[in-house]
């Protein structure tokens, strides 16, 4: 059986990266929540 997690840096960044988050209103809300919480890393 093939494992479900097949790492790819490109896919990771396109789906969860900073530019991807900034592209949508909800993504920006995610970033703002994480900033408010004081996360060291905002994305990936």
From Swiss-Prot:
<keyword id="KW-0687">Ribonucleoprotein</keyword>
<dbReference type="Pfam" id="PF00468">
    <property type="entry name" value="Ribosomal_L34"/>
</dbReference>
<feature type="compositionally biased region" description="Basic residues">
    <location>
        <begin position="31"/>
        <end position="44"/>
    </location>
</feature>
<comment type="similarity">
    <text>Belongs to the bacterial ribosomal protein bL34 family.</text>
</comment>
<dbReference type="GO" id="GO:1990904">
    <property type="term" value="C:ribonucleoprotein complex"/>
</dbReference>
<dbReference type="GO" id="GO:0006412">
    <property type="term" value="P:translation"/>
</dbReference>
<feature type="compositionally biased region" description="Basic residues">
    <location>
        <begin position="1"/>
        <end position="19"/>
    </location>
</feature>
<dbReference type="InterPro" id="IPR000271">
    <property type="entry name" value="Ribosomal_bL34"/>
</dbReference>
<dbReference type="GO" id="GO:0005840">
    <property type="term" value="C:ribosome"/>
</dbReference>
<keyword id="KW-0689">Ribosomal protein</keyword>
<protein>
    <recommendedName>
        <fullName>Large ribosomal subunit protein bL34</fullName>
    </recommendedName>
</protein>
<dbReference type="GO" id="GO:0003735">
    <property type="term" value="F:structural constituent of ribosome"/>
</dbReference>
<dbReference type="InterPro" id="IPR020939">
    <property type="entry name" value="Ribosomal_bL34_CS"/>
</dbReference>
<feature type="region of interest" description="Disordered">
    <location>
        <begin position="1"/>
        <end position="44"/>
    </location>
</feature>
């Amino acid at each position: 059986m093939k494992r479900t997690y097949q790492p790819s840096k490109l896919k990771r960044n396109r789906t969860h990266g900073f530019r991807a988050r900034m592209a949508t209103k909800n993504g920006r809300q995610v970033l703002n929540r994480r900033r408010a919480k004081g996360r060291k890393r905002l994305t990936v």
